[in-house]
From Swiss-Prot:
Keywords: Nucleus, RNA-binding, tRNA processing. It comes from Aspergillus fumigatus (strain ATCC MYA-4609 / CBS 101355 / FGSC A1100 / Af293). Residues 456-465 have a biased composition (Low complexity). InterPro entries: TRM6 (IPR017423). This is tRNA (adenine(58)-N(1))-methyltransferase non-catalytic subunit trm6. GO terms for cellular component: nucleus; tRNA (m1A) methyltransferase complex. Residues 456-479, 538-572 are annotated as: Disordered. GO terms for biological process: tRNA methylation.
Length: 572
């Protein structure tokens, strides 16, 4: 993540009302913040994050310098007011013990404020002090201000600051901020009401981490290599969270990209000089990472990953300098289950010699290179996905989990974690039942019975001794009727949930805040991929301790001789 604001970058603006607005900073444009005013985007481009600005209205000018950086001392003074606990509110009592000054007799209605709404609106138009003049006028015209305690006065002042101060704080857009932004807005269903706590559980149980920069051949011995299989229907939020953990979410600095491209051009220099195809594909290859990659399975022609645009990656027009350009791969369900039914995978473009290509026009030659490179990319990604050996499976979909795991779990390597997210617990309880121990035992027992019956039939028919005929495999179609999926492929299925709630802690009134958001809880199913053994394994239980036996039972010792230090021989 960059430490300063860059052009064409999405940033989050924290307003005084504690609301967050995400905007894209386009140079030479104006950013509008509603009632808080507007400012030119060029005034904050190039500045560091986490600065608080005040919008100063400058009439008669081009508003080139209409922002003021709020110093930390001023911010800290306001924070002390907001977090104060009423220091200096020691209530004086009279001789009878009755408080002299409280808020009980104060009636907070519109009559205490002498300024009308029309006067406040007129003052907004002529005010140039970022709202401070309006706050001062409101405090002066309040008739019951002297009756307030110090703490109630601080709360009143803070409430007016949130309403009239024209301030904003620039924050970088990360996964946690975007999750809360989508959850608190009106688009929570687009992300399946995924919360920050659930994202943490997904990354933890999925063992999502950076897979290293080594090549695929060099990293085979040091598994895992960071290849993850993902089904994401949250608009790309799960993919963004995984990419953040893997270090491939945020674009790198241009200096690092130039150095990387220079090194790549030196390594491929000879190949570019000898092959015309390599010259056309000299630019950065799309979906070419062999490790530390995310393979997204989608049901449509293109995956729905619209939320990745907040991190500088547009699925329709991807930037070659972005890490996701190489490290994120997309495969459709048709390409995964029946690749020859896909027109792009099945129809290979004709290979045209370089001599013939030299006679083509530039636009025709470019179209041929694009078509050929697209077929090679689809072929490579699909074959790699069907080969399997992934290091983890992350599922966040509204489809039936059993139908998804039936085709994706066999693609995982041994000890690979499986994580399934669902807003409700019912689909996950059914999934946990399908992988439960009783079902696994029944599946293995039934499978052994089928194998035993098949062996008996072969021995009776004499096929086992016939070398000319190939032995037939047992028919496991009956297992598919009784079991929706193979329960012996996953071990230790578990369902978990986690949710952070803000509580009101007061004597006798401790409960969750009534203003807290409801919605789905969000549940996580996780298990471990295992390979079932093809041998009959029987548990023998814990062996009992060996019993000591005297070697020569004929020479039994008397009670007096038993403590004479005679060695006792152990027999196994």
């Amino acid at each position: 993540m960059h430490s300063y604001i860059r052009p064409y970058q999405h940033v989050a603006l924290r307003l005084p009302s504690e609301l967050t607005k995400i905007v894209r900073l386009v140079p030479n444009t104006v950013v509008y913040l509603g009632k808080y005013g507007s400012f030119p985007a060029n005034t904050i481009i190039g500045r560091p994050f986490y600065l608080t600005f005040e919008i100063i209205d400058v009439s008669g000018e081009n508003n080139d310098n209409c922002l003021r950086i709020v110093p930390p001392a001023e911010l800290h003074a306001e924070t002390l007011i907001a977090d104060g606990e009423g220091e200096g509110d020691d209530v004086e009592v009279n001789e009878e013990g009755i408080p002299i000054r409280t808020n009980r007799e104060i009636v907070d209605d519109a009559s205490t404020q002498k300024m009308t709404a029309e006067e406040i609106e007129a003052l907004k138009k002529v005010s140039t002090g970022a709202g401070r003049e309006i706050i001062e006028k409101l405090l002066e015209s309040h008739s019951a201000l002297d009756q307030k305690t110090a703490f109630s006065l601080a709360k009143y002042t803070l409430r007016k600051r949130k309403k009239f101060l024209k301030r904003f704080t620039v924050l970088p857009v990360d996964v946690s901020l975007l999750t809360n932004y989508m959850l608190e807005g009106k688009e929570a269903m687009k992300t399946m009401e995924l919360r920050d706590e659930s994202i943490g559980l997904i990354g933890c149980w999925g063992n999502v981490h950076h897979g290293g920069q080594s090549s695929f051949e060099g990293a085979v011995a040091s598994k895992p290599n960071g290849r993850y299989l993902v089904i994401d229907e949250t608009g790309g939020l799960v993919v963004a969270a995984m990419a953040e953990r893997m270090g491939i979410l945020y674009p790198h600095d241009q200096e690092d990209e130039d150095q990387e491209l220079a090194e790549g051009s030196e390594e491929n220099g000879e190949r570019q000089q000898t092959n015309a195809m390599a010259q056309a594909l000299a630019r950065r290859r799309h979906m070419a990472a062999s490790g530390n990659s995310i393979t997204v399975i989608h049901a449509n022609k293109q995956p729905s990953l619209s939320l990745l645009r907040y991190f500088g990656y547009d699925q329709d027009n991807p930037d070659e300098s972005h890490p996701l350009y190489k490290h994120m791969k997309t495969v459709s369900w048709m390409q995964l289950l029946d690749p020859h039914a896909d027109t792009i995978y099945a129809n290979e473009p004709e290979v045209i010699p370089d001599e013939t290509l030299a006679t083509f026009k530039s636009n025709r030659r470019s179209a041929y290179y694009k078509k050929r490179s697209r077929w090679e990319r689809v072929r490579r990604v699909v074959d790699e996905a069907r080969a399997g050996n992934f290091d983890g499976l992350i599922v966040a979909t509204l489809m039936e989990p059993a139908s998804v795991l039936k085709h994706t779990v066999p693609l995982l390597a041994g000890s690979a974690p499986v994580v399934v997210y669902s807003p409700t617990v019912e689909p996950l309880t059914e999934l946990a039942d399908l992988y439960s121990t009783p079902r696994r035992t029944a599946y293995i027992t039934r499978k052994r019975e089928i194998i035993a019956q098949h062996s008996l039939q072969q021995s009776l028919q004499g096929q086992s001794q016939d070398n000319e005929k190939k032995p037939q495999e047992p028919d496991f179609s009956e297992l598919d009727k009784d079991f929706a999926l193979d329960p012996s492929l996953l071990l230790a299925p578990t369902i978990e949930t986690s949710r952070v709630r803000a509580w009101q802690v007061l004597p006798g009134r401790t409960h969750p805040l009534m203003s807290g958001r409801g919605g789905a809880e969000g549940y996580i199913f996780h298990a471990i991929r295992v390979f079932p053994s093809h041998q009959n394994i029987q548990a023998a239980g814990n062996p009992s301790r060996k019993k000591r036996k005297v070697a020569a039972q004929q020479e039994s010792a008397t009670p007096a001789e038993s403590g004479s230090g005679v060695d006792v021989e152990m027999q196994s």
